[in-house]
């Protein structure tokens, strides 16, 4: 029987979660969903000084917005300390762990000597017990660290689902500290115990963890646990070509939500930052899950491009049903200060969305257009105003306003009125349409003027044509 896939996302709650982080949640989530497996959320909060509940909340909020649901968790490492110490005691009993009394000062001096000799700085095994070896006398009043006995000789290797075969010489690995003098276990040990206890089958994470992997494989083997399949994802770079991080300006995932991006568009864009399905650039969440596998993970770093993200979002926005889009844009319209009673007074919102969605990249863009149909005061583009609303077209605007006051209210009737005024005034379409657009919506660039005016309504058109 094939083992059920179990993946995990294990962030440290030391700040907000950015796009580089969330991609490391997206792929294991997608792999679990694509294979009928389980996705586990684990919070690695052993850095007590920097970890905060507020950061945990932001992580969960960002994942919830992107609809990256977890089947188990969140589990907190700080709540599992008794379990770690229990497993650690077992490793001590089996001879895989030993106490090391080397002081920080002694370690520093050792490293300085090694570097002076152009050697790789590393622990030299002074306190490692071996047959026939006499250990130094145990110093009084010193609490030891616990070190893991790394196998000597040979290699440790794995077939990485993203990078191919990776191997390390065991001789390059020193004996890892897995418990501090106060008894608290260290990161690499906790991770292995968690993955063992949670039966994780696939570890899909950033390639900054590659150097941890040989050590973790040794710990898994010492525990008698199954070694999971590893996939180390290439780095996500920012627009300047640097590794994306909080320190160099990366935005929180939730900020993209507030800027009007759609969760499915974000999933689409992030999926393409390290995975591909042929030349397909735009796809739904369902298609992504149908297509996703670990065989098509890329090996080179993906570079974030906000212009491309906006384009992807625009494609998803256009594809949305008008009624669904109206519900999504509603809170963004209300954030502009518009009274909800005005928005709910009629059923124009889905039709306005239908008319303008092809011109928008985000829900914030669309909300800006929607607002113009309900407010009394709004800004006009000064350059468009000077260019198009001139004394030459004033008679045509007056004639058009007179016609609007009494015309039958339909898009077709308004279109007929425009043609009638053009003919009577001897003008071409842009000479009337452009100033009407500027006066009624503040810009010369709008969809079809008859469609816009039909939705704007007689009263607002007359007031705006008069105010010139």
Swiss-Prot record:
It catalyses: tRNA(Glu) + L-glutamate + ATP = L-glutamyl-tRNA(Glu) + AMP + diphosphate. Pfam families: Anticodon_2, tRNA-synt_1c. Its EC number is 6.1.1.17. It is an enzyme of class 6 (ligase). It is found in: Cytoplasm. Keywords: Aminoacyl-tRNA synthetase, ATP-binding, Cytoplasm, Ligase, Nucleotide-binding, Protein biosynthesis. A motif ('HIGH' region) lies at residues 11-21. A motif ('KMSKS' region) lies at residues 243-247. It comes from the Bacteria. GO terms for molecular function: ATP binding; glutamate-tRNA ligase activity; tRNA binding; zinc ion binding. The keyword Transmembrane does not apply. The keyword ATP-binding applies. One of its GO terms (cellular component) is cytosol. GO terms for biological process: glutamyl-tRNA aminoacylation. Catalyzes the attachment of glutamate to tRNA(Glu) in a two-step reaction: glutamate is first activated by ATP to form Glu-AMP and then transferred to the acceptor end of tRNA(Glu). Belongs to the class-I aminoacyl-tRNA synthetase family. Glutamate--tRNA ligase type 1 subfamily. Monomer. This is Glutamate--tRNA ligase. It comes from Delftia acidovorans (strain DSM 14801 / SPH-1). The lineage of its organism: Bacteria, Pseudomonadati, Pseudomonadota, Betaproteobacteria, Burkholderiales.
């Amino acid at each position: 029987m094939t083992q059920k896939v179990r993946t995990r996302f294990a962030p440290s709650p030391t700040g907000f979660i950015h796009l580089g982080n969330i991609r490391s949640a997206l792929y294991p989530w997608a792999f679990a969903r694509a294979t009928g497996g389980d996705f586990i959320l684990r919070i690695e909060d052993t850095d007590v000084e920097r970890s905060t509940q507020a950061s945990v909340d932001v992580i969960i909020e960002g994942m919830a917005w992107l609809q990256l649901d977890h089947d188990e968790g969140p589990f907190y490492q700080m709540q599992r300390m008794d379990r770690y110490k229990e497993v650690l005691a077992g490793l001590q009993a089996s001879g895989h762990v030993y106490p090391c009394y080397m002081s920080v000062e002694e370690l520093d001096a050792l490293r300085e000597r090694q570097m002076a000799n152009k050697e790789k700085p590393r622990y030299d095994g002074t306190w490692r017990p071996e047959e026939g070896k006499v250990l130094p006398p145990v110093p009084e009043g010193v609490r030891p660290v616990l070190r893991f006995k790394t196998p000597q000789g040979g290699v440790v290797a794995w077939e990485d689902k993203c990078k191919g075969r990776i191997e390390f010489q065991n001789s390059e690995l020193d004996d890892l500290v897995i418990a501090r003098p106060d008894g608290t276990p260290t990161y690499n040990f906790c991770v292995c115990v968690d993955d063992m206890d949670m039966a994780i089958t696939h570890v899909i994470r950033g390639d900054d963890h590659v150097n941890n992997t040989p050590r973790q494989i040794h710990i898994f083997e010492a525990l008698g646990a199954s070694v999971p399949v590893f996939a180390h994802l290439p780095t996500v770079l920012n627009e300047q070509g640097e590794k994306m991080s909080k320190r160099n300006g990366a935005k929180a995932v939730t900020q993209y939500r507030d800027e009007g991006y759609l969760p499915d568009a974000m999933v689409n864009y992030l999926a393409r930052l390290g995975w591909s399905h042929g030349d397909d650039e735009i796809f739904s969440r369902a298609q992504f899950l149908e297509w996703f596998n670990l065989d098509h993970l890329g090996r080179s770093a993906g570079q974030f491009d906000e212009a491309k993200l906006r384009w992807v979002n625009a494609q998803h926005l256009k594809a949305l049903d008008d009624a669904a889009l109206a519900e999504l844009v509603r809170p963004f319209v209300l954030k502009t200060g518009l009274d909800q009673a005005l928005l709910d007074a009629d059923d124009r919102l889905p039709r306005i969305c239908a008319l303008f969605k092809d011109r928008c990249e985000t829900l914030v863009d669309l909300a800006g257009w929607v607002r113009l149909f309900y407010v009394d005061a709004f800004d006009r583009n000064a350059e468009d105003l000077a260019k198009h609303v001139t004394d030459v077209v004033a008679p045509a605007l007056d004639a058009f306003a007179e016609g609007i006051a009494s015309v039958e209210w339909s898009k077709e009737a308004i279109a007929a009125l425009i043609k009638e005024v053009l003919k009577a005034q001897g003008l071409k379409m842009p000479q009337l349409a452009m100033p009407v657009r500027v006066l009624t919506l503040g810009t010369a660039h709008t969809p079809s003027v008859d469609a816009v005016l039909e939705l704007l309504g007689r009263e607002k058109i007359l007031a705006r044509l008069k105010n010139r």
